[in-house]
Regions:
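Conserved NTP-donor binding/palm subdomain of two-metal-ion nucleotidyltransferases/polymerases, i.e.
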Residues: 2-125, 130-253, 332-445
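Intrinsic disorder/low-complexity segments
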Residues: 201, 250-332
C-alpha cells in the first residue's frame, strides 16, 4: 500500500494552490519544510510552477530562508529565459524543415507550455518535432545533413540548434504490445493531416504547428505510458496532461452531458460506461478560431488563465437551445471517440489510474475526467512517480548500474514489477526489445 509522506502531502496541497483559481491558502503550509518542498519540486521539474504559487502567498506565509527564496527565484527566472530560447528554436527548426519541403508538428514541449496559465513557468526539455514522411525517407534526409545520427523506432537525433537538443520524429510515439502499437500507428496516420495544419503563434516570435487537443488526449497518454514502462515519469508530464484535459473542456465548454456521479466508482473498479449512452445526435465539432494568442513582446508576459495558446469559440454569448444542443452533441461525440481509442489501444485501465491522480493530486473535478478514475491503478502509478521522478532519474530502485548489461537487467526487473498491472505491455517488452535490435541494425549507418 502506498504511503505518502507528510511533506509530499503538503507539496500536493501547495501544487493545487499554485495551479488553481482558488485563493484559499492551504492550512498545511504552516507545517511546510520549504527545503523539502524545493527538493521535491526539483525532482519533479515543477520549480517554476510552484514559484508562481509562492508569488501568490502573503509574505507571512513564506516561511523559508532568504537564501532559498533567492535560489528559487533565480531558477524560475532561468526557466523563463529557457522557454524564450526554446520558443525561438522550435520556430526556426520548423521553418528550416518547411523550406526543405517537410511539414512538421511540434510535439509536447512548447505547445504544452501554451496551455499553462504562465507558459514561462514550465520546465522545458528538448524539441520533439514530428516530420511528415515514412521513417526511411526522414532518416535518409537527416543523415544527409548529419551522417552519424542514431535512429530508433520512432525518432532520430538531429544537430542541436543554439544548444537546444532536437529529436526528429517520424512516429509520435509507440506501444510495446505489437497489436496495440499497430492500431496506434494507424490512428496517427488517420489524423496526421489535422496536426500538420494546426498552426499557432508563440508569442510574437513566430508560428508553429502543434497537435489538436483531441490528438493530445491520446498521444500524450501514450507518451506517459511509454515512460512508465521504460524509465519512469514525473509530475511534470502529469501536469501537462492536466492542462490537456482543461484545454479539452475549454474547447467543448458547457457542452458535456457527463455528470460527476458517472466517475465516482468503487475503489479498484475498472468498469466503464458504454460510450453509446453518452452519444449525441450530431457529429460536428465546434469551430476553432485560427487567430492565436499573442504576448506583447515575445517574452514572458501575463497570459489569461482561460487561454490555452489560441482563441476558442466563445460559448458564453450564445445560450440558445439550438446552440447548446449542437455543442453538447459534438462534445459527447468527441469524448466517445477518445474513449473508443483508449479501449482499442488497451489503455483504459491506465487512463483510469491517471484520472485518479488528476483528482487526488491536481484537484480536478470529476466532471472533467475522460474515463472513470481507477484507485488501484492510480495509487500504483503515483507511487512510481514519487519513487522515480522525472524520467526515472531519481529512482533508488535502479540497482544494476549504468552498463548495457545493467540497463537490460533493470528493464527485466521493471517488467516483473509492472506485469501485474499491465501484462500485455510488460510481457511484450522483451520481445519488442529483441525486434527493435534488428530494426536498428537495418537502419544503422
Amino acid at each position: 500500500m502506498m504511503i505518502v509522506s507528510k511533506q509530499h502531502q503538503i507539496f500536493f496541497d501547495f501544487l493545487r494552490f499554485s495551479i488553481g483559481p482558488k485563493s484559499e491558502i492551504p492550512s498545511s503550509l504552516k507545517e511546510a519544510d520549504w527545503k523539502a518542498l524545493y527538493r521535491i519540486a526539483q525532482k519533479q521539474c515543477l520549480v517554476g510552477v510552484l514559484f508562481d504559487g509562492i508569488k501568490k502567498l502573503p509574505a507571512e506565509y513564506v516561511g523559508m530562508k532568504k537564501e532559498l527564496l533567492l535560489q528559487w527565484m533565480a531558477e524560475s527566472q532561468m526557466l523563463e529565459k529557457a522557454n524564450v530560447r526554446l520558443n525561438d528554436a522550435a520556430i526556426q527548426v520548423s521553418e528550416w524543415f518547411r523550406k526543405k519541403g517537410f511539414r512538421t508538428c511540434i510535439l509536447k514541449g512548447q505547445g504544452n507550455a501554451l496551455m499553462y496559465p504562465n507558459p514561462y513557468s514550465r520546465t522545458p526539455g528538448d524539441i520533439d518535432i514530428w516530420v511528415e514522411g515514412e521513417d526511411k525517407r526522414v532518416i535518409s534526409f537527416v543523415r544527409s545533413i548529419s551522417p552519424h545520427e542514431k535512429a530508433c523506432y520512432h525518432h532520430i537525433g538531429f544537430p542541436s540548434y543554439k544548444g537546444v537538443e532536437v529529436e526528429v520524429h517520424y512516429r509520435p510515439s509507440f506501444l510495446l504490445c505489437f497489436w496495440h502499437n499497430r492500431k496506434l500507428q494507424k490512428y496517427y496516420e488517420r489524423v496526421k493531416e489535422e496536426q500538420f495544419s494546426h498552426r499557432v503563434m508563440l508569442g510574437k516570435q513566430g508560428e508553429i504547428a502543434i497537435p489538436t487537443v483531441e490528438f493530445n488526449l491520446i498521444f500524450q497518454l501514450t507518451h506517459i505510458f511509454s515512460h512508465l514502462m521504460n524509465e519512469g515519469i514525473g509530475l511534470r508530464q502529469l501536469l501537462d496532461y492536466y492542462y490537456v484535459l482543461c484545454d479539452f473542456y475549454k474547447v467543448y465548454q458547457k457542452s458535456s452531458k457527463i455528470t460527476p456521479s458517472l466517475f465516482t466508482l468503487k475503489e479498484g473498479s475498472t468498469s466503464h460506461p458504454d460510450p453509446l449512452t453518452l452519444r449525441g445526435e450530431g457529429g460536428n465539432r465546434p469551430i476553432r478560431c485560427s487567430e492565436p494568442l499573442r504576448s506583447k513582446d515575445g517574452g514572458p508576459s501575463k497570459v489569461s488563465p482561460d487561454s490555452a495558446g489560441w482563441d476558442r469559440l466563445s460559448i458564453e454569448g450564445d445560450n440558445s437551445a439550438g446552440s447548446t444542443t449542437a455543442v453538447t452533441s459534438s462534445a459527447s461525440t468527441a469524448l466517445d471517440e477518445v474513449q473508443e481509442e483508449l479501449k482499442e489501444l488497451g489503455l483504459w485501465k491506465f487512463a483510469g489510474g491517471i484520472m485518479y491522480i488528476m483528482q487526488e493530486v491536481f484537484g480536478m473535478s470529476a466532471s472533467r475526467l475522460i474515463v472513470p478514475p481507477n484507485e488501484k491503478y492510480g495509487k500504483f502509478v503515483l507511487n512510481e512517480v514519487l519513487e522515480a521522478g522525472n524520467f526515472g532519474r531519481h529512482d533508488a530502485r535502479n540497482r544494476f548500474g549504468r552498463s548495457q548489461l545493467g540497463h537490460n537487467l533493470q528493464r527485466v526487473y521493471r517488467d516483473i514489477r509492472l506485469v501485474r498491472y499491465f501484462p500485455a505491455e510488460a510481457l511484450c517488452e522483451p520481445l519488442f526489445r529483441t525486434w527493435h535490435f534488428f530494426w536498428r541494425l537495418k537502419y544503422k549507418k
